[in-house]
Amino acid sequence: MSPLAKDLDDNQIVDLAAYYGRLFRGAIDPAESGRYVGIDIENIVSNGDVARRLPPCAACHQVRAGGPIETPTLTGQYAQYLEAQLQAFAGGRRHNDIYHRMRSVAAKLTPNEIRMLAIRYSGQ
């Protein structure tokens, strides 16, 4: 990239940065960002929510987390796909989870939490 980038002027660099910044998978549209105020998604990922009997996502889905062998790593998956699958688990439309684990977990998440988790895992 260096041979190509060395001839760019400051405006071209800014334009390229803006272009690539918009390509971030799962970015939140600023118009809808108010829907997510007060959601601590990192806490749900790392610690879960004891009050709702919600286990931490990272306990099973983090790379080398040591979760059940059938548990997929979510890092880098497309946000739209993750959101659709979490919604399907929550609504009982997807039922290939052993012992109903994901149906139970996803049913406890709000739609906004599902969206934020999908965005969070897609952006890693």
Report each predicted region and the residues it spans.
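Alpha-solenoid repeat scaffolds
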Residues: 27, 51, 67, 93-96
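Generic structural signal for alpha-helix termini and adjacent loop/cap motifs
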Residues: 23-26, 47-48, 63, 92, ...
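The canonical Cys-X-X-Cys-His
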Residues: 16, 20, 54-64, 117
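Electrostatic cytochrome c docking/interface patches
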Residues: 22-51, 72
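C-type cytochrome heme-c attachment and multiheme electron-transfer modules
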Residues: 10, 44-50, 54-58, 110-113
